[in-house]
Amino acid sequence: MSATTPSSHLIFLGTYTKKGSRGIYAVRLDAASGALSAPTLVAETPDPAWLTLSPDKKFLYALHPSPSQAIGYSVTVTPERTSLTPLAIPASAHVPTAPAPAAQPPSHLAVDATGRTLLAANYRDGFVAAIPLGPDGTLSPPTLTWHSGQGTDPQRQASPHPHSVTVSPDNRFVIVCDLGLDRIFSYALTSPNPGAGGLHSPAATLTPGLTPSVATAPGSGPRHFKFSADGRHAYANTEMGGTIEAFTYHAATGALTPLQSISSLPADFTALKSGAEIRIHPNGRFLYTSNRNHDSLAVFALATGTGLLTSVEIVSCGGKTPRNFALSPDGSWLVCAHQDSPDLTVFRVDASTGRLTPTEHRAPVSMCVCVLFYD
């Protein structure tokens, strides 16, 4: 390895703590071989099912079943150890108007580029929270943006279900996929300047964009969202539709124009569709998504000029219910987590074709549902 290439990548793992897992784990991926170290518990906390880092990587935030919506940790990484130290959650950080029960956790988190706002999509209660962050990483009272309405499926879409929050590359907009409404919302993000002499800035504000939302197919359920490497296009996977929706992204207004819809499943698949995660390769040329009920990973070639997708392959994920996966920063490896089988699987990634080759490397983690590369 060169002096600038790490010999291993640190990964944080989020879990559901129902079948033996106890919280957030850390594991290392050998950059040359793809081998995984034994996972170690770094934070004992209930159901940290989504994790995100501050831009400077000093703080990690996890979903938390409390009125604060999330819990923060200071991150310490040395050659000898990796540790997470929980930050205090003051009572003032609690959601002021959350409906009972007031401890419903969100489904997804993101930190804006300034590191001063934590955004949370609350699937169960139907709102998006903008939570101010102090220089010490601690949370303050949020502002809430509520969604209203319903979709076409009376069981799954009787009310709004914001499923993810994604900050635009220029930090001017927040994109929210609402599974319950079959809509993807675009909000202008106003991040206030740090308060003079105060610990926390005022809360950021979310204002509907000039084109406030774009519809997906009825009953499709948009879930997660990613921007292309050049920021000209964007992609959402649909949980209930089993598709990838491609858009032209208009950076000046935050608007999305539908471009393409392509299935992530084989043509002969007739069981319940359940799309999970979506990622774009660091080189910008390939898109990956996971299909839970099919236990597969789908690979697409991404035309950087037009933004259009072409199917490359669909491969077994090597486990059951691939709720989450992530690519290493150098794009050489893909690590897949499984909600219903107790292990991680590792794939070698061909950077020229996007294709995945399974390896023998695994690591035991029960109900792992989030993979977050630290470096």
Identify the meaning behind each predicted range:
Residues I89-A100, T143-Q157, T211-V214, L259-T270, ...:
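Surface-exposed loop and turn segments in beta-propeller and other repeat-based domains
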Residues R28-G34, S74-T82, I131-L139, A188-G195, ...:
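Short loop/turn segments immediately following beta-strands, especially the blade-tip
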Residues Y16-K18, P65, Y123, L133, ...:
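Short loop/turn segments immediately following the C-termini of beta-strands
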Residues T82-S164:
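Asp-box/WD-like beta-propeller blade repeats and closely related beta-sheet repeat scaffolds
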Residues T5-S7, P55-K57, A113-T114, P169-D170, ...:
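Residue-level detector of Asp-centered blade-edge/turn motifs that repeat once per structural unit
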Residues A38-V111, G115:
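Blade-loop segments of beta-propeller domains
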